[in-house]
Amino acid sequence: MNVVYLHYHLNHGGVTRVIANQIRALALTYTDPAHLRFGLLSGGSADNWKEDLRASRQMPEVLIGVLPRLQYDSQSGVEPVELATDLRRQLAEFGFGREDTVLHVHNHSLGKNAALPGALRRLGAEGFALLLQLHDFAEDHRPANYCHLLGSRDHGDLFEHLYPQASHIHYAVLNSRDYSLLWQAGVPADRLHYLPNAMPEVPHLPDQAAARRTLQDRFGVPCSGLFLAYPVRAIRRKNLGEALLWAALFPSDLQVGITLPPTNPAALSHYERWKQLAAQLRLPVYFELGGANGLPVAEVLAAADRILTTSVTEGFGMAFLESWMAERVLVGRNLPEITADFVAAGMRFDHMYDQLRIPVGLVGRAAVEEMLCEAYRQLVHAYHLPDPPPNVLSELIDERTHNDLIDFADLNEPLQEQILRRIVAHPPVRQEILALNPTLAQALAAPDFERQNLIHLNRQVVQRSYCPAVSGARLCRIYDKLLTQPRDVSVTGLGPENRLLTHFLTPNRFRPMKG
């Protein structure tokens, strides 16, 4: 069996790490490793991938092909037929035939390369077995990506184009939510696979006291008080304002550490504003603790008393697994539609909240209503869709401001900033918010034995349900099934209505900072 993984780039990041873990997991569990060969195709950008491979344990030989037409494209200059030709030629150079090769493609429909969906459809029509793994959706608050794919098509035509259907074209998803979405959109259950990410063992962490001293020496983080590490690249949907809110609510009890700045220029302005605000308000928040000029992530985790997450959306939600493997309790924002699978496996998230309630009156109802309506209109318009009707906007306002409270994550950055300034200027506001959200103080005050029991429980579940061996077994079953399917060269689509777009743009899924 030959397995060829395909992604736009091999830079450090989530999907690249997933691919590396999948290769390791499959090599670990495949019953006939002598007859298992790996290929890897990307657009050519690969920050130290080969060095990572050489340093990695349990990594087999991988043939690497570079296809420049596979890179991110800002304009639709590449024709699908050209990219299909490149892919076909590279597979032939690997010596991989159509009959015993699975092409495992990550995020083909995300809108990073407008030619890729059409190229894959051509290969599918020629009988190549395809596993299309979806981590993220262009339909989910990514209008620029979606419109790049849309071009001159209408929405129904694009839906047909993006999600090809045939007996030898299967889909893999990270969670039950996405499984349900694709099934409801028309993907047959026998071509749809639940494929959560594998969670490798975390290397042994340094001594906590030594790591705290290093943080103090390098970044001025005091050794006193609790240290909450937020190991994240601070893009907009990571909801950095809420991390600052933790610091504002407990200014003398804790410090918050953010590891990485965004690399996307569009996110930098928000990030720099949060840095300026933290300095102005003298909040105990420390930035860029990781990366090239910072500390290794293991040292930041070692220094932490808790791991924090405030993200408003995730694909798989690796953050909900990693903290327990690092033997640290996770606090902050729960994402129930993501963590539902983890809870079903036996995990508990006792010190997390689904909402962080804020009195609407702190910023004014008129400002909140105007912000929600305008932000939702802008999102809908960005997808080239008509203005939402007034009753939809009214329902959005009523649902988000029930009992004159609003979730902090439903505010945009300017309104979040107003809340932070009010807390610092008027200490009674701090107590009002803490009274509405008792989970925050409870998460910090939980006794050691309780935290250790929770860590032990969740760590066992992660090791049992999300280990590389389990992931490898899943991959084996999926690939074996794909290779035994009849090669139906009649490739169809899912129908004229983009049900995924309809789902993701419903008001109850809207967040101002998801983009």
Task: Show which residues each predicted segment covers.
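Catalytic cores of nucleotide-sugar-dependent glycosyltransferases that transfer UDP/GDP/TDP-activated
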Residues: 1-515
